[in-house]
């Protein structure tokens, strides 16, 4: 009897843990048709020319976020890093990524639509839209981007 009761109690604790873990992941499902996405200016750490939409979550807060960045051909993001892992999926166009602290087009890898990259926390990297396109970025917030060379940071606070 005691073994059965302990086993049942253990099962309840495990099941509650699974339920709470699933509930912590999201407040509900998210489905978005492309026409429903609202595009606007990205955070000021991105150079002018790109637009961004938040697909889910809130990149300014702790927790999972998904954003999309729409860039014209030739748009560059100078060498930088993030304190958390960054997952990048190319939705359309060709997106080029390079690793290191110096922007070097010759060493970049082209990712076509459907391409994916995982950029671990602290990894120095840079990017360029080889053609006009959209990338989807997801990670754990709050989103932060630190330029290797502070002079590359286009945000107003960078000049202070």
Tell me the role of every PLM-derived stretch.
Residues 30, 106, 126-160:
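Double-stranded beta-helix
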Residues 58-60, 95, 101-122:
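Short acidic-glycine-tyrosine-enriched beta hairpin
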Residues 1-4:
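Positively charged n-region of N-terminal signal peptides that target proteins for export
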Residues 8-18:
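Bacterial N-terminal signal peptides
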Residues 20-65, 152-160:
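A short, N-terminal "cap"/entry segment at the start of jelly-roll beta-barrel domains
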Residues 52-55, 66-79:
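N-terminal post-signal-peptidase region of extra-cytosolic proteins
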Residues 77-79, 97-98, 119, 124-130:
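Short beta-strand His + acidic residue motifs that chelate non-heme Fe in jelly-roll/DSBH
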Residues 72-75, 81-102:
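Glycine- and acidic-residue-biased ligand/ion/polar-headgroup-sensing regions
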């Amino acid at each position: 009897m005691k073994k059965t009761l302990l086993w049942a109690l253990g099962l309840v604790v495990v099941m509650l843990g699974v339920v709470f873990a699933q509930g912590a992941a999201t407040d509900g499902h998210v489905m978005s048709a492309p026409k429903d996405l609202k595009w606007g200016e990205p955070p000021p750490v991105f150079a002018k020319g790109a637009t961004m939409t938040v697909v889910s979550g809130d990149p300014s807060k702790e927790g999972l976020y998904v954003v999309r960045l729409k860039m014209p051909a030739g748009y560059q993001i100078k060498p930088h890093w993030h304190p958390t892992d960054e997952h990048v999926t190319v939705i359309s166009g060709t997106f080029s990524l390079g690793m290191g602290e110096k922007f070097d087009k010759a060493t970049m890898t082209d990712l076509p639509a459907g391409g994916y990259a995982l950029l671990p926390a602290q990894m120095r990297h840079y990017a360029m839209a080889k053609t006009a396109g959209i990338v989807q970025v997801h990670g754990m917030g709050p989103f932060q981007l630190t330029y290797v060379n502070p002079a590359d940071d286009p945000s107003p606070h960078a000049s202070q």
